[in-house]
Amino acid sequence: MTSPEAADTPFEPKKILAQLPHMPGVYRYYDATGAVLYVGKARDLKKRVSSYFTKTQLSPRIAMMVTRIARIETTVTRSEAEALLLENNLIKALAPRYNILFRDDKSYPYLKLTAHRFPRMAYYRGSVDKQNQYFGPFPSAWAVRESIQILQRVFQLRTCEDSVFNNRTRPCLLHQIGRCTAPCVGAITEDDYAIDVSNAARFLLGRQSEVMNELEQKMHAFAAELKFEQAAAVRNQMSSLATVLHQQAIEVGGDSDVDILAVVAQGGRVCVNLAMVRGGRHLGDKAYFPTHVESALTLAEGGLGDEADGVDDAAAAMPDQPVEGEGDGDGGAAARVAGAGAGASVEAEVLDAFISQHYLGNRVPPVLVVSHAPASRDLLELLSEQAGHKVSLVRQPQGQRRAWLTMAEQNARIALARLLSEQGSQQARTRALAETLGLECDDLATLRIECFDISHTMGEATQASCVVYHHHKMQSGEYRRYNIAGITPGDDYAAMRQVLTRRYEKMVELAAQAAAADAATGIDGESTRQAEASSLLPNIVLIDGGKGQVEIARQVFTELGLDTSMLVGVAKGEGRKVGLETLVFADGRTPLELGKESAALMLVAQIRDEAHRFAITGMRAKRAKARQTSRLEELDGVGAKRRQRLLARFGGLRGVVAASVEELASVDGISHALAEQIYKQLH
């Protein structure tokens, strides 16, 4: 049940607090504009929310947030675990300013073995199903592809698409170099291939020694039967496997699946390094950098805000979570997780946020090795409940796990140092550009730059790109592509006019509507919508082009009533060499040649190159799609479903063109008469 406080009534904390129940749930704080400030959970909503307004020793950040609260909403849940799950979903959806946020990375790669009678080994991203076998997740695409190469070398499983597999008449190059047993042409029986698939799966699950022993027995059996050629093939397989195991000897431990989480804070930023061990193999790591840490609350459950008499209980509860299956000397006290207590650190809060946002809704390994004790005592229980198996946290590991944690902490420090260095250089470049262009900006982090580029191939598949630079970095989530239509092919000026009009016309209309609403209601000052529209307008608009392109942009901005001083063209220098560009202005200022050593020009070139990359990749994809599908789309009697069946059956347009009438007629939904018609239209 959700209980919102009406937005049109004065905010009276005492009245609201008196109505709150002593039940678990989630609370949300809003400011006067309706923006979400903070989302939290509680075992007891009344005591938790009341603590924000009754405590006198609030930190400056918490006190600042409390002064901005204009509305409170609460949702009662059946349990605290349910509240934790709802809190996580709301944080991801609403991105409150005072919550620690991690990028929602749901696209971890997996290694997939398909359910085909000759299973295919493939790189995969997306949701998993029960039909196929999935191994992972892996921390990077490189880790998956490395594993695929290992399995190709040792077990020679196929990697080709089913459409290619079904249409091969002779082995491919991978068979010739010993990377595939060519099941497509019957070079291996289904039973023998199934054995290789089983061995590959056990290898990925960390049962390498078991696979090696079975291969050795198989080799001796072949030799005893005087099948020396088969025995030699198994020997070579064992040799390849032994080489792989030797190369990974440092990485292989006794654990099957373990995640290592190291949190490091420095220079006002925090890094979480996640290292993954799958099947006993250390697959690498990935660094995460949360946002809103500088304004996030240092409030752990059981800390400042929960029931006072429950603080000690919260601190004492976490050590009662033993770690199962400790075979490397982690036993005793080291196998338990210490409670965070009332004084939860920033690292503990960040770890809480990461575990909640990363694992809830995703696969969880049975063991998490952590550098800090998490602040929430309920997190472990919820993870175990969701995963369907016990999830253990190890705070003070020993042996191989200790080495893994130390390495993760070191990598977190390195990644954080690199980030701080890059941020420093980016901030210097932003400052240099603002000074060069004479911009007055109190907070350089709010400086917003948008850059436009046009891309096409001899007038074909024209696309415009818009990339955004904000908060000292490229904001890929705000990139946009625009399909350009209704112009003369190859007319870059018309394309630029169209994209600028489409981009900024809506913003101007929104601001005008908000201003009209203010006038009608008698409200003094900008409305929220008008403020939002104004905040989206950039401080600088970069145009990839010279005087002609800038003149078109000036005309569009004049028609829309926008300030033309923000328009800057980036004219390429002699030979298109970086550092020789000239900045061209729409308001009549003298063009600038900054030189290749200029920090301002480095930033301009970085943004311009990103706009070009984004435009050209979109244009190529659009062109390829048009060329691949255009001929099939023109076929009479062939709709989307039949076209999809043809492409799946023959592996692409080239295969459809090469197919005979009989082969075309063998496709489901294609009659012999239609097959003849298709054949005639394609030849």
Swiss-Prot record:
Where is this protein localized, as stated in its record? Cytoplasm
Q: Known InterPro entries for this protein?
A: GIY-YIG_endonuc, GIY-YIG_endonuc_sf, GIY-YIG_UvrC_Cho, Hlx-hairpin-Hlx_DNA-bd_motif, RuvA_2-like, UVR_dom, UVR_dom_sf, UvrABC_protein_C
Q: GIY-YIG domain spans which residues?
A: 22-100
Indicate where this protein is primarily found: cytoplasm
Please report the stretch or stretches of sequence annotated as the UVR domain: 209-244
Arranged from A to Z, the UniProt key words for this protein are: Cytoplasm, DNA damage, DNA excision, DNA repair, Excision nuclease, SOS response
Q: Name one GO biological process term.
A: nucleotide-excision repair
The record's section on CDD domains has: GIY-YIG_UvrC_Cho
Molecular function terms, GO-annotated: DNA binding; excinuclease ABC activity
Among HAMAP family, the record links this protein to: UvrC
- So what family is this one in? Belongs to the UvrC family.
Q: How does it assemble?
A: Interacts with UvrB in an incision complex.
- Describe the function of this protein: The UvrABC repair system catalyzes the recognition and processing of DNA lesions. UvrC both incises the 5' and 3' sides of the lesion. The N-terminal half is responsible for the 3' incision and the C-terminal half is responsible for the 5' incision.
The name this protein goes by in its record: UvrABC system protein C
* Origin species: Burkholderia vietnamiensis (strain G4 / LMG 22486) (Burkholderia cepacia (strain R1808))
